[in-house]
Amino acid sequence: MEKTFDKSIFYLFIFAFIIILFILNNSAFNDNLPTCNNFVVNVYLYLALSICSIAIFSYLINYVLFGKSRQYYRPLELYEILNSIGSPFYIFSIIMTFVLIILIAFSNGFDNNNVGYNHVIWFLFLFFISVTIYPKFKDITTYNYVDNALLITSIIFIVMTYFYYMFSDLFLNNMSSIGMGLLVSLIVIVIVELINLLFFKRSQYFLSFFKITSYLVIILFSVFVSYDTAEMAIREKECTSLPNYPKFSIDFFMDILNIFSRTLFLKSTK
């Protein structure tokens, strides 16, 4: 049985985190304040920092829960993981994730003097969302597919980013209609999945239907990657001073997270 949370990978993420932090400090900040210089690069650096933070937090959570036991490397059943985390804290983490993402969404994008506050709520968001997705890395039914799901997610992200740059005029000239279409599609999928969960959970078709909607979610958030890339290009032109880079990186992060989660689900339920 393969082991989970190899410590050599943890050290690799620590090293990557430090390198990205060093580059970010030189690229995005001047006199400890964020600048508009290298705007696009800085957003991607914050995205990379977010991903490294999720990995580091997940390793730390695993160490806190199982560091002194043989279960540190072992994949476990989902109920064992949730019992170790504690259901109240897990639910609290889900609630805090939503609260913090709302706070980030309503923070100013530019001319934002609350640099420390912006980074604190962003870092707290990354911690609490790490708690909610940590079980996917430890669960005996999904852990073996994490690398594959990450690879597929990375390919989708790169391809859809390239797709925007190939057809940038298509997106930039139709931002409102594309954005509305994506929003309506997302709302419809959420409603349909809630109906499936509430009324058809015990049906023999529940899992098959959820697989279908998972493919739709992957397609939807793949388009979101291109749309958010277009948004970033617009924000770069609008930037005047003190950009809120944590806020701008969150959209890409959520795109990646949704694509990864659904890809992992589909891989683990073949």
Task: Describe the function of each predicted region.
Residues 1-270:
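A hydrophobic alpha-helical transmembrane-helix feature that marks the membrane cores
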